[in-house]
């Protein structure tokens, strides 16, 4: 394949994020990269796509920058760009927990586990494995037996922990996320909250799936990614599907956004049911005047009314 997708982050000091963002955007555009990069005084968090030559130049440039010494890139081969545009944006945090007293992973974070060590932890009876991602990411794929926090945003995780603290306080905690950046901060937060034995999967699911020894074993489903691919394979030992179709509950790994632009909820839907229910998550959203599916497919008012009737057949 002629293209690659890079996933990376580095907690480091960037003195002037706004200036860095402006200059870095120009650099990325010169390389004809596309993607999303967040920068703040605490570091950089990015995912970009580009040709093999362009991504080689990009990785070399960051590795030669003293601020990013030791940066690790997770690399996926791709058939083309995984993004439509290139954005580099300054932010308060490169991953938002929105804590009053923020956690600095360079000073406080959980123990790092290699893929092999993490696999052993998955099999341990005295260890609780907590998924540090959002609920819709978990629903598409997760490690076998992992706890699913009921959250739609990373910043909601601290409140969820406070509500469920008593269940886990005396346990060994192991956490994981897509590439490792959320766990760096989340595991530090757990230590700050009084949890004593906290570890994290170094390099995240992306690293675990490429490890030649673990081969993604004990991962069920697919890994959600924040680009146009939507999902990627992880388990190369015994693949299973855990995602359930929004309307009929059958196995499904196809995510779409609800066609109501004011909702935009992510749902797992088959192509057949996307058409049947006008790309929406509910009758209310399907009948919305700005339904994107209706506009995209030039569906007449008569046909729209006909398909809206399909919602009556759903089990209440």
From Swiss-Prot:
Indicate yes or no for the key word tRNA processing: yes
Q: What keywords does the record list, in alphabetical order?
A: Oxidoreductase, tRNA processing
The record's section on Pfam families has: Rhodanese (PF00581), Rhodanese_C (PF12368), UPF0176_N (PF17773)
What are the residue boundaries of the Rhodanese domain, all occurrences included? 123-217
Q: Which reaction does it catalyse?
A: uridine(34) in tRNA + AH2 + O2 = 5-hydroxyuridine(34) in tRNA + A + H2O
Annotated GO biological processes are: tRNA modification
Please name the GO terms that the record assigns under molecular function. oxidoreductase activity, acting on paired donors, with incorporation or reduction of molecular oxygen
Residues at the active site: 177
Gene3D superfamilies under this entry?
Answer: 3.30.70.100, Rhodanese-like domain
Function field:
Catalyzes oxygen-dependent 5-hydroxyuridine (ho5U) modification at position 34 in tRNAs.
HAMAP family, per database record: TrhO
Identification of the protein by name: tRNA uridine(34) hydroxylase
């Amino acid at each position: 394949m002629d293209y690659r997708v890079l996933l990376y982050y580095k907690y480091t000091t960037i003195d002037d994020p706004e200036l860095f963002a402006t200059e870095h955007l120009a650099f990325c555009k010169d390389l004809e990269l596309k993607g999303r990069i967040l920068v703040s005084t605490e570091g950089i968090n990015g995912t970009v796509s580009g040709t093999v030559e362009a991504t080689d130049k990009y990785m070399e440039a960051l590795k030669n920058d003293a601020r990013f010494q030791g940066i690790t890139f997770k690399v996926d081969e791709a058939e083309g760009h995984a993004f439509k545009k290139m954005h580099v944006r300054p932010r308060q945090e490169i991953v938002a927990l929105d804590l009053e007293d923020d956690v600095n992973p360079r000073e406080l974070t959980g123990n790092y586990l290699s893929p092999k060590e993490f696999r052993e932890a998955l099999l341990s009876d005295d260890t609780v494995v907590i998924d540090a991602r959002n609920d819709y990411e978990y629903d598409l794929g997760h490690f076998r037996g992992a706890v699913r926090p009921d959250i739609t945003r990373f910043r909601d995780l601290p409140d969820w922990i406070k509500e469920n603290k008593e269940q886990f306080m005396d346990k060994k905690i192991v956490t994981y996320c897509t590439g490792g950046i959320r766990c760096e901060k989340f595991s530090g937060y757990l230590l700050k909250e009084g949890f004593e034995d906290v570890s994290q999967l170094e390099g995240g699911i992306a690293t675990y799936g490429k490890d030649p020894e673990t081969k993604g074993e004990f991962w069920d489903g697919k890994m959600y990614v924040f680009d146009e691919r939507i999902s990627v394979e992880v388990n190369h030992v015994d693949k299973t599907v855990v995602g359930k179709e929004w309307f009929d509950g059958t196995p499904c790994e196809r995510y779409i956004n609800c066609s109501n632009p004011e909702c935009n909820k992510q749902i797992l839907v088959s192509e057949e049911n996307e058409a049947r229910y006008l790309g929406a998550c509910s009758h209310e959203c399907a009948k919305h005047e700005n339904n994107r599916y209706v506009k995209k497919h030039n569906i007449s008012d008569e046909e729209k009314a006909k398909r809206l009737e399909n919602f009556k057949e759903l089990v209440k």
